[in-house]
Regions:
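Active-site core of bacterial EAL-family cyclic-dinucleotide phosphodiesterase domains
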Residues: 15, 162-201
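Beta-strand residues that line the small-molecule/cofactor-binding core
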Residues: 30, 110-112, 178, 196
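Conserved long alpha-helical elements within nucleotide-processing catalytic cores of c-di-GMP signaling
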Residues: 2-29, 36-63, 73-77, 81, ...
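A short pre-motif secondary-structure segment
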Residues: 69-75, 109
Length: 201
């Protein structure tokens, strides 16, 4: 099937690096594809239908690779990647085409596909692996435009680092018993009776 024919992670990264090295004069984006709530898709329609969806996506991407000569890859789960021009119209065309794969025949639930983009020219020091990582960060940080296309910005990475730092600090504080728990009474202003408690940390 198509999933066995599409390049896996290491092969794709090598193909992508070779492609970018030989097409430096053109503007490219590395794109990560995300089927939003794919686990829910599996839950609703079964893993067989989920596997069929992945196979259909892989088939479309292999057709794209055959006609365009640009690398595509599959990293497992629902993680697909491709290289495409830094051109909004062509990017939107890809989203529309691939969306047909995830629009189910069942009309009760609609699933959407998103594209996370990392513009290669904006990150000249990044290798293929870093570009893919940035594209994955972008696809998980929707801009609420409704377009299904999310472009990487360094602020996304800064936000992830800040979140991780906060989680580390919270874990450290829990380990060292640095939180104090208080119960503040809530009183009826007329009867002055205690009617509840408010938890404060």
């Amino acid at each position: 099937d198509a999933l066995t024919a599409i390049a896996r992670k290491e092969d794709f990264l090598q193909h992508l690096q070779d492609f970018l090295d030989t097409h430096k004069t053109e503007k490219w984006c590395v794109a990560a594809i995300d089927v939003e709530h794919f686990r829910l898709y599996n839950e609703l329609y079964g893993t067989a239908q989920g596997d069929a969806l992945l196979n259909t996506l892989a088939s479309h991407l292999l057709d794209y690779q055959k006609t365009s000569g640009r690398p595509v890859g599959y990293w497992g789960n629902d993680d697909f990647f491709l290289c495409l021009p830094d051109d909004r119209v062509q990017q939107q065309d890809i989203v529309i085409t691939l969306q047909t794969c995830v629009s189910p025949n069942h009309q009760d639930v609609t699933f959407f596909l998103a594209l996370g983009l990392c513009p290669v020219s904006e990150h000249p020091e990044a290798d293929a692996a870093a570009l893919c990582n940035y594209a994955q960060i972008a696809v998980m940080n929707p801009d609420h435009s409704g377009s299904g296309i999310h472009r990487f910005a360094p602020a996304m990475l800064d936000s992830l680092k800040a979140q991780q730092q906060l989680l580390s600090e919270l874990e450290h504080a829990l380990d060292n018993h640095e939180f104090t728990f208080f119960l503040q009474p809530k009183c009826n202003s007329i009867t002055r009776a205690i009617v509840g408690m408010e938890a404060l940390v």
